[in-house]
């Protein structure tokens, strides 16, 4: 599926996006295309993929059930009945001004389409992650959002991808994806395994005390 123009199936990018995701029960991915993120992230209770291309929806494959929606992303997102435990990941066509390639999407975006999408995303009352190349337009429209830049490798070489998001990352939903990059993830994994071994070697009373202390931290006490 990496053949899709704009695919996120590039070195380190999928992991970084998934690691950023906060806890959620419903996952909505717009502009699904090849669905690189949907295919690689653990499933939510409900998973929804949106695309204007019927061909992309028909060809999309995933190890778990996904509701495939043939619709304009901004219309679906504006009309969806949000319950408070959703996460939206939005990967629209790159802005023309940021592209280094002449390749085009089957269903492309003009600037007014980007502005309409941003208007909808800003109004959503749930966590949103938006990806693209660094853009002054996005920075200005999403001035109150946080952002993160990543160096990734694609068919054209090394490019800078940018993520914009409307929440404060404070906990990782899936431990296997924790970390800024592969090296950081391996460091965290080794540290977690070391702490797990130490915890397993403790007497029951000490385990209980440590567990109570950790739960107090998570509760903000």
Give residue spans per PLM region.
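Class I S-adenosyl-L-methionine-dependent methyltransferase catalytic core
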Residues: 1-221
């Amino acid at each position: 599926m990496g053949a899709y123009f704009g695919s996120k199936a590039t070195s380190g990018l999928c992991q970084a996006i998934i690691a950023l995701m906060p806890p959620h029960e419903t996952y909505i991915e717009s502009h699904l295309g090849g669905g690189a993120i949907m295919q690689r992230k653990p499933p939510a209770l409900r998973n929804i993929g949106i695309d204007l291309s019927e061909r992309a929806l028909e060809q999309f494959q995933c190890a778990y059930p996904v509701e495939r929606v043939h619709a304009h992303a901004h219309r679906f997102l504006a009309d969806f009945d949000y319950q408070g435990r959703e996460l939206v990941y939005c990967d629209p066509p790159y802005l023309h001004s940021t592209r280094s390639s002449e390749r085009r999407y089957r269903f492309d975006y003009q600037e007014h389409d980007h502005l309409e999408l941003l208007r909808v995303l800003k109004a959503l009352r749930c966590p949103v992650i938006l990806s693209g190349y660094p853009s002054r337009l996005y920075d200005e429209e999403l001035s109150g959002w946080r952002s993160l830049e990543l160096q990734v490798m694609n068919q054209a070489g090394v490019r800078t991808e940018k993520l914009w998001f409307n929440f404060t990352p404070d906990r990782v939903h899936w431990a296997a994806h924790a970390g800024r990059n592969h090296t950081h993830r391996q460091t965290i994994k080794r540290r977690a395994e070391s702490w797990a071994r130490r915890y397993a070697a403790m007497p029951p009373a000490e385990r209980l005390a440590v567990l109570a202390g950790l739960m107090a931290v998570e509760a903000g006490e």
